[in-house]
A protein has these predicted regions:
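Juxta-kinase regulatory segment immediately upstream of eukaryotic protein kinase catalytic domains
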Residues: 4-37, 41
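ATP-binding pocket architecture of kinase catalytic cores
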Residues: 38-198
């Protein structure tokens, strides 16, 4: 179908009023630390997303994504931009499908929170609302499922040492930590008592 949205891109919207970036602060920072260019810079917001706020930045012909935690209080470990940057600034070397993160900042005076800037990759998330041209075709759905599995196998085949990520994380006790963490998040966020969840 026809492209809609900002810059002819259906993923992009005008920045929401309450989620607007202060471009007057971040633009000089990006020019000094990443772009090294005085080409025109434009900003928009990605309309989708599930938690973190994601913004589009174009400088000349180059496209980037700025990611920051959501507004309001967040659990310290659930939106760790520094960790996300650390992983994505290295993982692409052993897993070329990963977008490369170029820049991390913990200077909250720039946009109100820590953030990182990564390359933009075009595509779509595998969710129940697949693009219309991929719905209902059993063969296409099977091929997508196989591609997802193959991609996960390739990701899990990356040797952490080879991409300088061997000191990341604590693999021992992962499942117990996840269960404990999600239980705490549930208790912090619930507004209805559902005994079956406890």
């Amino acid at each position: 179908g026809p492209m809609t949205g900002l810059f002819g891109d259906s993923e992009l919207i005008e920045m929401r009023d309450d989620e607007r970036l202060d471009t007057s602060r971040i633009e000089p920072y990006l020019r000094e630390n990443l772009f090294k260019s005085d080409a025109p810079m434009s900003f928009a917001q990605f309309g989708g997303g599930r938690a973190n706020l994601t913004y589009f930045v174009r400088c000349g012909d180059d496209e980037y994504v700025v990611r920051r935690p959501p507004l309001g209080p967040v659990a310290a470990s659930s939106h760790d931009m520094k960790r996300e940057h650390r992983v994505l600034s290295r993982l692409w070397r052993g897993f070329p499908l990963a977008p490369r993160s170029f820049l991390y900042s913990d200077d909250v005076s720039l946009i109100g929170a820590e953030f990182h800037v990564m390359e933009r990759r075009h595509g779509f998330g595998i969710r129940p609302d697949l693009p219309n041209d991929l719905r209902g075709d059993t063969d296409t759905c099977r091929r997508i499922g196989e591609m997802v599995i193959d991609t996960l196998v390739a990701l899990h085949s990356v040797d952490p040492h080879s991409v300088d990520l061997d000191s990341l994380g604590r693999p021992e006790g992962f499942a117990a930590r996840q269960l404990n963490g999600w239980t705490k998040r549930w208790h912090a966020a619930k507004n209805t008592d559902l005994n079956d969840f406890d």
